[in-house]
Amino acid sequence: MDIDPYKEFGASVELLSFLPSDFFPSVRDLLDTASALYRDALESPEHCTPNHTALRQAILCWGELMTLASWVGNNLEDPAARDLVVNYVNTNMGLKIRQLLWFHISCLTFGRDTVLEYLVSFGVWIRTPPAYRPPNAPILSTLPETTVVRQRGRAPRRRTPSPRRRRSQSPRRRRSQSPASQC
């Protein structure tokens, strides 16, 4: 079976493969981040989002993998074989878990569309020959200049006043928002 854990989120294993392995923080750092930012949602019996569910599953898989690693460490007598198993788990499984954790934490933090746009931008950047690309790689925490961040249900503000209307000299009154519109 060819199962891609990112497919339902609009990404793919191939898209994440453009990011170098040292790009991803350690599992410990990612688990600490997930706990600090999303502990309540992850521990809640309520369903939040598919990203929360996938993050829960990745955390549970890592826990099971660590249980297996402890068992191997305690029960495998041959040190060379034990080292092979530990190195394989850290190199292959560790990277996959780090990618999964990073992807879902980033989607929850920055939004799925921003993360997907970042992955595509980075993929284009890394495949462009060095002589023809900007010196710095795209950065996820920097929103693209074209992104407009505003509350739902409000019309975009004009940047300049209409030439037909004079600006009032008195300060503008702010409309109070209803509690329902703050979600």
Curated annotation (Swiss-Prot):
Region of interest (3 X 8 AA repeats of S-P-R-R-R-[PR]-S-Q), residue spans: 155-177
Phosphoserine found at: S162, S170
BP term (GO), one: symbiont entry into host cell
Region called Disordered, residue ranges: 136-183
GO cellular component, one term: host cell cytoplasm
Composition skew (Basic residues), residue ranges: 151-176
Protein name stated in the entry: Capsid protein
Gene encoding the protein: C
